[in-house]
């Protein structure tokens, strides 16, 4: 058998359904203690049927939901600033001096991914997402594509978690 180890300790390897084109870096999200979780390109994911998804709602409802979360939005000139990580996922949504984390925003609006884009269109806020899941660790869609091309489980794990795969006795 095999185990994933980092600095002598077994790690609980995260996984998710479908990336936004690449996986997220553990270091960017959680700091040095997650340095073992690397960002890698997942080139086949953009071809997935559910890669792009769109959700829309009335602008008043959208901003009302943000305000209920403590994000103060100026009514006359609402401006949201999105901060992204290197894989394109939203880390933070800021309106003036208040903000909400990207994952919390994802939960609030019931989005499939925190890789999202906002666009106001005729009284509606349109939220377009890429991928499904948190984007950390093993991308199930890409791993499945690699397996269908003949990659072994060990090769797939080594791709997503380089240097962590250890053979057990």
Report the location of each language-model feature:
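Conserved, single-site charged/polar hotspot
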Residues: 1-169
